[in-house]
């Protein structure tokens, strides 16, 4: 049984979630983080700030996003009812924009005219470029060159929106390398630059701040589910790369002990193959990108190359709050392979007329595995974190089709 987490109030003042989180950064960044922490503490409860944030979410993003009962998919899988939280319907096509708006509003109040971001699948990059255009800010996005190749359409979108995209050639040329480069930029240009991190990782206050801006997802669900289904779900399921869409839907439910929280990681070609990105199910605690969390590392603490069909889950770490929720027994984490995710992707397209992101397809795949083991009156709520337009090339390529 999960240990009872009495009224959840993490992180502590130093950004710790139990033994995870914290601030492991070069001295050169500690001033910037102190400044950010102070600004966030000052504005997070400021009525004017909240009013502007909520206005943008409603009128620019199109929130609240609906919840949809996937009846044909439910029938196909058998068992429990499957509901989808439609983050794919947000402007820019994913959950990422919820967080970017919050951080960009903070950047403006801090007088920083330049924003930088890292991106894997390109969704966070597109959201950042979009909001930078909306507010007239300079924008630079760092992206691993391998991801630039995989996500050509999103790269072009960012450029259309006025951002400069910098391909990163170091390491595995994916998300972790882009994050390293973005941090280097921030150290150099800290006076006029705000670093918009796209997930619940990084040094404090990022994991807390990103979670708070994404929590709008779960807050809406708590209102919508009783209206739609008559009660709260039995389980909430979300994919986990860094883990911001999952934290956004989990956080408001943490104190609801009857709601099971399930995070779905990328098992790639299978956990035993070594080619995966499942930090929580296949990793061990260590320090990466300024925080202590579960990582995919070898005996010497060197980061292992990760693999996933989905660029957005292809990250060797995970948000520290997920690490804590796993150890505390409040959330459970499972793996879904490339093959299973691809099957769920095709199923949703054909049965519901919704093309999901490959990331979200991992959560869907697990819901379809879990549903038949449960009675028909049980309810599974899946966070459909993004739409699949960006994955057309990847999926077509796997089917031997050249777009």
UniProtKB/Swiss-Prot annotation:
One of its GO terms (molecular function) is tryptophan synthase activity. It is an enzyme of class 4 (lyase). It catalyses: (1S,2R)-1-C-(indol-3-yl)glycerol 3-phosphate + L-serine = D-glyceraldehyde 3-phosphate + L-tryptophan + H2O. It comes from Ralstonia nicotianae (strain ATCC BAA-1114 / GMI1000) (Ralstonia solanacearum). The lineage of its organism: Bacteria, Pseudomonadati, Pseudomonadota, Betaproteobacteria, Burkholderiales. InterPro entries: Trp_synth_b_CS, Trp_synth_beta, Trp_synth_beta/beta-like, TrpB-like_PALP, TrpB-like_PALP_sf. Its EC number is 4.2.1.20. The beta subunit is responsible for the synthesis of L-tryptophan from indole and L-serine. Signal peptide: none annotated. Keywords: Amino-acid biosynthesis, Aromatic amino acid biosynthesis, Lyase, Pyridoxal phosphate, Tryptophan biosynthesis. CDD domains: Trp-synth_B (cd06446). This is Tryptophan synthase beta chain. Belongs to the TrpB family. Pathway: Amino-acid biosynthesis; L-tryptophan biosynthesis; L-tryptophan from chorismate: step 5/5. One of its GO terms (cellular component) is cytoplasm. Its cofactor is pyridoxal 5'-phosphate. The modification N6-(pyridoxal phosphate)lysine is found at residue 96. Tetramer of two alpha and two beta chains.
